[in-house]
Amino acid sequence: MNSYPKFAEIKGIKYEINTDFRVALECNEIANNSEIKDEERSLAIIYLLFGEQGLNDYENWNSLLRIAIKFLSCGKEIEDEYDNEEKEENMDYQQDWGYIRTSFFSEYAIDLDKEKMHWWRFYELSCGLSEKCILSRVRFIRDFDISQIKDSAEREKWIKQKEMVALKQTKNEKSSEEKRLDELFEKQLRRWVNWAKQMDI
């Protein structure tokens, strides 16, 4: 059985982590909201994951941010370099929530509206969804390259399908959304760390 982290420790101080997958998804939204200042985003994520204890412990903000990134990236270490190749996104947790919820119920008999679940388990299960589920089918349609279709009627059919499931364009939308969550948060961390250095944290 997998052992998922529930606490973090810095200099002998123990912090309880809010491990609920809904909180992690909220952190993802905040990290991708360019209308919020970097320092406000970082503090919001510290508060969501570590509560008042983390928010009040300003001397350890930098360390808490690094732990937050590692937690949100499901334990993967932060690397100095990453693949910054931009890809067209094919999923958005907020816009696709209905597809995600339906897919979890059909594949795992899990009702996400009622289930309490650790973020890491949610992420692992979402990665394990089969090609048959509605979310996977929608993502396939979004990714499908219609340029390979020669028949005009068939091409028109695919164009309509793509329009039906297309993600809505938003101000805060990032072209790298499709990348693994750890890559997204690694990028964000670099801004937070630079801000923390300026604040001499």
Ranges and model annotations:
Residues M1-K14, F21-A24, N32-I36, L43-I201:
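Charged interaction scaffolds used for protein-protein
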